[in-house]
């Protein structure tokens, strides 16, 4: 995540994170929604916090760069 956020070659707004969202099932946020990446949570501008263990997939554009096995 830090690579996409801080490296000048990447546009962080193209990052998409899919995560388990109770009770909805799955939800997705973009890099533009992310305020801070903490040790255990990703904090959103909306005030929500996504625990790292609920993340199931990270994409950059259309490419899946990480998927939970």
UniProtKB/Swiss-Prot annotation:
Coiled coil: none annotated. InterPro entries: MJ1316, UPF0248. Belongs to the UPF0248 family. This is UPF0248 protein AF_0420.
């Amino acid at each position: 995540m830090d690579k996409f956020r801080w490296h000048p070659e990447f546009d962080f707004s193209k990052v998409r994170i899919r995560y388990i969202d109770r009770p909805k099932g799955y939800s997705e946020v973009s890099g533009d929604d992310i305020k801070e990446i903490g040790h255990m949570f990703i904090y959103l501008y909306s005030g929500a916090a996504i625990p790292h263990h609920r993340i199931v997939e990270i994409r950059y554009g259309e490419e899946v760069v990480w998927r939970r096995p």
